[in-house]
Amino acid sequence: MIGVVVLGATGRMGRRICRMVIEDEELELVGAIASPTSKHLGRDVGLVIGVGETGVEIAPPTALPNIAKDADVAIDFTVREATLENAPKAARAGLDLVIGTTGFSDEDLRVLEHEIEEAGVSAVISPNMSLGVNLLFELTRQLARVLGDNGFDFEIVEIHHRHKVDAPSGTALELAAIIEEELGKGEKVFGREGNVGPRDDDEIGVLAVRGGEVVGDHTVMALGEYERIELTHRALSRDAFAKGALVAAKFVVEAPPGIYSMRDVLFGGKRGEGL
């Protein structure tokens, strides 16, 4: 059995991950971490998420070193500030990591990856753990590779629930980065307003829409003079992300020390390798 600690266990994603870890025959939930100010501290996580008693109490981040003694991997779906503080603690305690938090700057990622590498553990870091979204990444790569030199413009539209705190989504930014990489050029434009003039050939438009309880929609458009291609992924449940996180957890505990992406999990290799 693979021992799992869930960081952000009482959040939207954390609750789903805890439930799915409990249901998975290869995994064992050994720790549930929540904010130091959480009203659920000290309660059985199973009672909080509605699955009955589990014997696992919700604990603050200060409990990580002790909980890590019985764990193999930490799954972190929290917020930028919490991950930057707690993920290095988990790594120094010897835990491999699966990080699905978004909202990092490039410098944040450099610092985080350095801490993980210094600790000598393995980590999967991805803005979206959904298996379908990671296939969308690969299809977008092919789309840009084939059409990029044929006069097509690329635009990205993402839609999320009204509670999401960062925009555009990490997934949309990753899609834009993939297009930039394949084109060898690109300038992200975040929405348009006023007299902006004609579209520049290097632009990659990124539009964020917020409202309702949309789990997450992402559309990549390749717009040519005579035709348009759209690739769309719609998440129907947060379980799509939780399922991917569990797949990543099973991968990372067997992987050599280093930094991995979901591309590596699905297609093999290490960051920068694969398809």
From Swiss-Prot:
Gene3D superfamilies assigned to the protein according to its UniProt record, in alphabetical order: Dihydrodipicolinate Reductase, domain 2 (3.30.360.10), NAD(P)-binding Rossmann-like Domain (3.40.50.720)
Listed pathway(s): Amino-acid biosynthesis; L-lysine biosynthesis via DAP pathway; (S)-tetrahydrodipicolinate from L-aspartate: step 4/4
Chain sites annotated for binding (S)-2,3,4,5-tetrahydrodipicolinate: H161, G170, T171
Its biological purpose: Catalyzes the conversion of 4-hydroxy-tetrahydrodipicolinate (HTPA) to tetrahydrodipicolinate.
Enzyme Commission code: 1.17.1.8
Family assignment from sequence similarity: Belongs to the DapB family.
Keywords from the UniProt entry: Amino-acid biosynthesis, Cytoplasm, Diaminopimelate biosynthesis, Lysine biosynthesis, NAD, NADP, Oxidoreductase
List of catalytic residues: H160 (proton donor/acceptor), K164 (proton donor)
Residues given in the record as NAD(+) binding sites: G8, A9, T10, G11, R12, M13, G100, T101, T102, S126, P127, N128, M129
Protein known as: 4-hydroxy-tetrahydrodipicolinate reductase
Main location as per UniProt: cytoplasm
Superkingdom per UniProt: Archaea
Catalysis performed (reactions): (S)-2,3,4,5-tetrahydrodipicolinate + NAD(+) + H2O = (2S,4S)-4-hydroxy-2,3,4,5-tetrahydrodipicolinate + NADH + H(+); (S)-2,3,4,5-tetrahydrodipicolinate + NADP(+) + H2O = (2S,4S)-4-hydroxy-2,3,4,5-tetrahydrodipicolinate + NADPH + H(+)
GO cellular component, one term: cytosol
InterPro entries on file: DapB_C, DapB_N, DapB_N_CS, DHDPR_bac, NAD(P)-bd_dom_sf
PANTHER family: 4-HYDROXY-TETRAHYDRODIPICOLINATE REDUCTASE 1, CHLOROPLASTIC-RELATED, DIHYDRODIPICOLINATE REDUCTASE
One Pfam short name: DapB_C
GO molecular function: 4-hydroxy-tetrahydrodipicolinate reductase; NAD binding; NADP binding; oxidoreductase activity, acting on CH or CH2 groups, NAD or NADP as acceptor
